Amino acid sequence: MPPKKAAPKKLHELAPEVRVGLKIDDISKKTYIVGKQFATGGFGRIHTCTEDGKSQQMVMKIEPSTNGPLLTEVVVFNRILKKDMIENYKKAKKIQWIGLPHLIANGYFTYNNEKMRYMIIPKYATSLEAVREANGGSLSAKDSLTVADCVLGALEYLHDSDYAHADVKAANILLEKPNDFSSAVLVDFGLAHRTTNNVDKPDKKRAHNGTCIFTSTDAHRGNNPSFRGDVEILAYNLIMWISGSLPWLSLEASPDKVFEAKQKFVGGLPGTLQSILTNQPAPVAGCITTMFDVSRKTDYTHKVDMAKLRKKVTEAAQSASTGAQKKPKMTPSRDTTATPKRKSQRAPRVESEDEEEEEKKEVEIKPKKKVQRSRKVVEDDDEEEEVIIPKSTRSRKTKEEGTPRSFNLGMTSSTATSDRVAKKIEMKYKRLATNKPSLVPVTVADASSCESQYESNEPGPSSRVVKKRTSEERDANGEVQLKTPALVSPDVKKTKYKSGISSATKASPTELRRVPGVRNFPKGRRSMIIKETSARYQEKRATRNTKPTFDDSSCSSEV
């Protein structure tokens, strides 16, 4: 009886959708909350996630526990991509940065009676593939070589750890910062292979493993991933990034034909490469040719001299940058028919339409801004007072030229006397501004009463003789026009100002202390003000009761 045939291997299944907000407990007693799904990789789903109680977002890959790709990746992370391992490597090599992610957490959880495997790694800004598509399907030579240098550094770490990546492509390269190509990080280790047991023995079952248009000729033959294969894969990617196409791109559905096209291309170097990169400096094509030469001359099980390759890539990037600065307009537009994904040719710099619209709005709005200028209000023939009107006020417009304002004080006095009274009023307001309690501003009516006493022939207490005014100095109404200084309040009227506080109240310390305005003064100052004010008004009342004489000080201090 013939032996039974082995049961066919179960194909990988796509992971079921996991609801947002699901909490997963880690073996380290940390809780992670599943976020929204933003991508699908292989047979798994890729979600954002956060640690419970924290806001920093991370990436969680979820697959059924029976699937192999995520298991392979978890094994690689646990063996060589833990955070402390990467830090020790950087210290040993004396480097500050390396383009590889580190493992945060991994494990199992049950969802709808199905066992699921998960892995958590850091979250990055964007993928190189998204940037390439946004740029019309290609990148500049300088940016492409900058990314290649980062990838070579990551591959050097993997090769030193006896692992080959086997799936280098733009979709598996992430940027830590948008448009910062020097921060490229190599991810997705689902096809990574440990090379310690590699033997140059092709197996048809493994033929064409990887991404068909980029995979190495070793993989097309059926060999396991190798160190030289990673360099060859990166060289194919550089051609795709710079030119936007590959000669075998339309043959992707037929892996055997792709393999034949690659063999012809590599056999015809450097001429076949120069025919594609016609508009690039010679060092750029020379750098990629060197990568193909190294991959062909290196033995299947031997490691590649990454330091030599990185030096060549750096020199080519510098020459590409210099050539772009010298001739920025000489690069013709590329043929977009070779790459189906490319829709339109765009500028190298990635800029969203929203940012362009905002810049246009700012340019349109700026000329419309009105500059508020100061206006001058004429207060006198000789002096002008500049008044700066704030934007928020809506005051009436004042003419720059016109008749000076004047107040009719209703008194007959000479020009010199009226100027003297005006100066007294000005001095009173200045002293009032210094919070001197013994000074009270006078009104125009008080000044008028004082002038009427100055006109008498009887000498007052001030023993000053004042000449009477002549009728020639008066206007048609018998009044004198006095131009008020800026310190005189425009609300001054002819009538006597009434404060609402009687002289009897001011003369009584007890009553004066009860006045609300007096309470605003500090205690020590309040007592001094009450004492001075009551003493002055008591003396004034006593003088009025005994002999009605003229007191010059009362003219300037009585309210």
UniProtKB/Swiss-Prot annotation:
Keywords, alphabetical: ATP-binding, Cytoplasm, Developmental protein, Kinase, Nucleotide-binding, Nucleus, Phosphoprotein, Serine/threonine-protein kinase, Transferase
Residue intervals of the Protein kinase domain: 32-388
UniProt PTM comment: Autophosphorylates in vitro.
GO-annotated biological processes: cell fate specification; DNA damage response; establishment or maintenance of cell polarity; gonad development; regulation of fibroblast growth factor receptor signaling pathway; signal transduction
Residues engaged in binding ATP: 38-46, 61
Coiled coil regions, renumbered to chain: none
Enzymatic reactions: L-seryl-[protein] + ATP = O-phospho-L-seryl-[protein] + ADP + H(+); L-threonyl-[protein] + ATP = O-phospho-L-threonyl-[protein] + ADP + H(+)
Matching PANTHER family: CASEIN KINASE-RELATED
Protein name as annotated: Serine/threonine-protein kinase VRK1
